[in-house]
Regions:
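Eukaryote-biased RCC1-like beta-propeller repeat architecture
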Residues: 1-4, 8-234
Length: 234
């Protein structure tokens, strides 16, 4: 299928190779020209991310591509420059080796990627999958989740309890969320308006479990609020 990009472009976020606005959809040819097939897309306030597979005859590697505003390291390239065309993210930590990206979400100025690889099933992990969550860019409110409140220009692993297998992720403007296979919801980042659901208005710099009375199925986030689908009792 064809990728369409439109609306505002002040820092290359549309990926067309210029800084011109578009007032109607325009095909983004970068991936077609390289025989790459997008399968996951995400958009932040001023940056864009696509996960692609390589088709037969591909002339560029598969994986994660990002472009747009680079301030705070939004693009995960190890630098803070804007990019007006898609850039392959190659700055992963060693634990990413063998991983396959299955999900992504972008916040106002930060990025989350969920990746997995197959492992032998066990009592603690009957799903037979190991999943890692990676985050990068602006961390001033703790939204990266690595127990610090500093920016990260490269993907950094976010650690949840070992028994948890993340199923879905979401980003608000400055907070992050993850739903696990056990039905647990974890939240971190900016909490000034109660968007973390933790009963107060404090920021969190690492994942913290929300209300254990519900089995969460899906989560979504707005600028300063959170929406979830849940069963009443586990």
């Amino acid at each position: 299928g064809q990728r369409q990009m439109c609306i505002r472009d002040r820092d290359g976020r549309l990926g067309h190779g210029d800084y011109e606005d578009r007032d109607e959809p325009e095909r983004l040819v970068f991936f077609d020209e390289r025989k790459l097939a997008p399968r996951i897309i995400a958009a932040g306030d001023a940056h864009s991310l696509v996960v692609v597979d390589a088709a037969v005859g591909a002339t560029a590697p598969e994986g994660v591509y990002a472009w747009g505003r680079g301030a705070h390291g939004r693009l995960g390239l190890g630098r803070t420059l804007n990019k007006k065309t898609p850039q392959h993210v190659e700055t992963w930590p060693s634990c990413y080796k063998g991983m396959h990206v299955i999900g992504a979400a972008l916040g106002g100025a930060h990025s989350l990627v969920l990746a997995e690889k197959a492992i032998p099933a066990s009592g603690a992990n009957p799903w037979g999958r190991q999943r890692h969550l990676y985050a990068w860019a602006y961390g001033g409110n703790g939204q990266i989740g690595d127990e610090c409140m500093t920016d990260r220009a490269r993907p950094t692993r976010v650690k949840l309890p070992r028994q948890e297998v993340v199923q879905q992720v979401a980003c608000g403007k400055a907070h992050s969320l993850a739903v696990t296979a056990h039905g647990d919801l974890y939240a971190w980042g900016k909490g000034w308006r109660g968007e973390l659901g933790l009963g107060d208005d404090r920021n969190r710099c690492g994942p913290e479990k929300v209300d254990g009375k519900h089995q969460f199925l899906k989560v979504a986030a707005g600028d300063r609020h959170t929406l979830a689908i849940a069963l009443k009792h586990k």
